[in-house]
Amino acid sequence: MDEEAAKPRDSTVNQQHQYYYGTFQGVANFPTPTPPPQFMQPQHPITTFPGHAYQNLQGHGGGVNYAQGFPVVVPDYTVVEVRPMIEHELPCCGLGMGWFLFIMGFLFGGIPWYLGAFIVLVTSVDHREKAGYVACSIASVVYLIAVMLGMTGDINIW
């Protein structure tokens, strides 16, 4: 029992080898600056406890030794709480006019697709409805190509 009491425990190993962990440690070949004399704190031996995992140990890297670790409150940080912005509902059962014109284009032979392409090119639309209008403009181009190829399909040049 005397031999075990004489051996140092894992948590009380030489405190000179435990380094301060911070975000900036400085350059290895440049000595750390000493704090001004009015801010010098007396060096107390750092005692460690085996059950506590997070301790603020100050080694050769310097730094501020807080009593309970790192500070919890960040100074000069204001929290601004605002009400959430409420957007209006989209027309046509929440789909928006763009997707409504896209669906109606299948029923009315592509004319609503040209209307949707005209709207997206000329006016400023809601960002939520823009996908439907872009789908209308793509469908109008595909419809135009299909009609042109369909019209030339009956002519035999060969």
UniProtKB/Swiss-Prot annotation:
Report which residue ranges the record marks as coiled coil. Answer: none
Q: Which UniProt keywords apply?
A: Ribonucleoprotein, Ribosomal protein
- GO cellular component annotations of the record: ribonucleoprotein complex; ribosome
PANTHER family tied to this protein: 60S RIBOSOMAL PROTEIN L18A-LIKE, LARGE RIBOSOMAL SUBUNIT PROTEIN EL20Z
Q: Which family, according to the similarity comment?
A: Belongs to the eukaryotic ribosomal protein eL20 family.
**UniProt protein name:** Large ribosomal subunit protein eL20z
Species name for this entry? Arabidopsis thaliana (Mouse-ear cress)
